[in-house]
């Protein structure tokens, strides 16, 4: 699995990591969560990303998680592994380990956080990772979390690398439009912003790497189908109702809101690991009313987020 398999994926879910109350991974909860996603239009799954609370996972835990999910998925959809850190050497070592582990269409490597590298430093970081193994690399560009932004010009330099096959772009629609217009033919562009998915797909993006697909996969699929069928009136109507739900999902540090909803739905998502904490009970109730029930009064009263949330 690689570029061709991922090209078919419109909705890639950034999978949560289910935890027990003591903070250990709840491997028994994984099968039901996976089957739920696949029943509601998830086309691919990202493991050990931000939504999985990857900063709190050891590499050994990530490998255990990979094995557990691969066993359940059994090749039904492509999988992407989170492989990047702000340490190039550590990223290289883990990318090699994941490549040897097998079963992944690609690895997702984040722009280095905290170090604040230059554009050339970021270019060399990703080039070196991509050179290190035959695992295809997708770049994760999210300046709201990492402080620095990989510019479209640097991204296009990296897009020429044969082992860099795409980007999860969380900057602006202007940057996304530029990348779509100038990218190599076999280079995937996903938005990482659920609220931007409508606009990104209309610009020509390949899909979304999503948190909302844990809970709202059906309406996302319906919206994407309407776009593909050029029914903009229907797609826009879905988007108008979808935006408040996205804002609710990011009204508290993610993935606390989506975990609260999944727990409410009967899935054992469990708590978050520190330094993240669960959403307060009253906030969680209001989030559930918006995302699950589409409660208009709850939306008016409590959900005042933005199209591109901070979290």
From Swiss-Prot:
**Keyword field contains Lipoprotein:** no
Where is this gene product found? Answer: Cytoplasm
Read off the InterPro entries from this record: Aldolase_TIM (IPR013785), DapA (IPR005263), DapA-like (IPR002220), Schiff_base-form_aldolases_AS (IPR020625)
GO biological process: one example: lysine biosynthetic process via diaminopimelate
Q: Which UniProt keywords apply?
A: Amino-acid biosynthesis, Cytoplasm, Diaminopimelate biosynthesis, Lyase, Lysine biosynthesis, Schiff base
Query: Entry's Pfam families?
Result: DHDPS (PF00701)
- Decide whether keyword Zinc is in the record: no
Q: Which GO terms describe its cellular component?
A: cytosol
What coarse category fits the chief subcellular location reported for this protein? Answer: cytoplasm
Group of enzyme by EC: lyase
Pathway assigned in UniProt:
Amino-acid biosynthesis; L-lysine biosynthesis via DAP pathway; (S)-tetrahydrodipicolinate from L-aspartate: step 3/4
User: Could you tell me which CDD domains the record lists for this protein?
Assistant: DHDPS
Q: Which residues bind pyruvate?
A: 51, 209
Q: What is its EC number?
A: 4.3.3.7
General function of this protein? Catalyzes the condensation of (S)-aspartate-beta-semialdehyde [(S)-ASA] and pyruvate to 4-hydroxy-tetrahydrodipicolinate (HTPA).
Q: Could you say which protein family the record assigns here?
A: Belongs to the DapA family.
Tell me the subunit arrangement. Homotetramer; dimer of dimers.
Q: What is this protein called?
A: 4-hydroxy-tetrahydrodipicolinate synthase
């Amino acid at each position: 699995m690689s570029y061709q398999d991922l090209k078919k994926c419109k909705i890639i879910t950034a999978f949560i990591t289910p935890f027990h109350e003591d903070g250990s991974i709840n491997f028994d909860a994984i099968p039901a969560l996976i089957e739920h996603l696949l029943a509601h239009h998830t086309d691919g799954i990202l493991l050990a990303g931000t939504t999985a609370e990857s900063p709190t996972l050891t590499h050994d835990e990530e490998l255990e998680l990979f094995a557990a999910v691969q066993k359940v998925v059994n090749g039904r959809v492509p999988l992407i592994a989170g492989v990047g850190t702000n340490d190039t050497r550590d990223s290289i070592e883990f990318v090699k380990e994941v490549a040897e582990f097998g079963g992944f269409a690609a690895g997702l490597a984040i722009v280095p956080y905290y170090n604040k590298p230059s554009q050339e430093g970021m270019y060399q970081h990703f080039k070196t990772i991509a050179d290190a193994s035959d695992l295809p690399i997708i770049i994760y560009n999210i300046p709201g979390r990492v402080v620095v932004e990989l510019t479209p010009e640097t991204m296009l330099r990296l897009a020429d690398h044969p082992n860099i096959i795409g980007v999860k772009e969380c900057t602006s629609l202007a940057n996304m439009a530029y990348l779509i217009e100038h990218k190599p033919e076999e280079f995937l562009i996903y938005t990482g912003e659920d609220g931007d998915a409508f606009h990104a797909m209309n610009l020509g993006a390949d899909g979304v790497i999503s948190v909302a697909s844990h809970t709202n996969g059906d309406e996302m699929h319906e919206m994407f189908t309407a776009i593909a069928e050029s029914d903009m009136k229907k797609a826009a109507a879905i988007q108008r109702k979808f935006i408040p739900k996205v804002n609710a999902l990011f009204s508290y540090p993610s993935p606390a809101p989506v975990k609260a909803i999944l727990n409410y739905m009967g899935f054992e998502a469990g708590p978050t690991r520190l330094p993240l904490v669960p959403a307060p009970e009253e906030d969680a109730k209001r989030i559930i009313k918006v995302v699950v029930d589409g409660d208009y009064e709850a939306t008016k009263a409590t959900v005042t987020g933005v199209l591109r949330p901070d979290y």
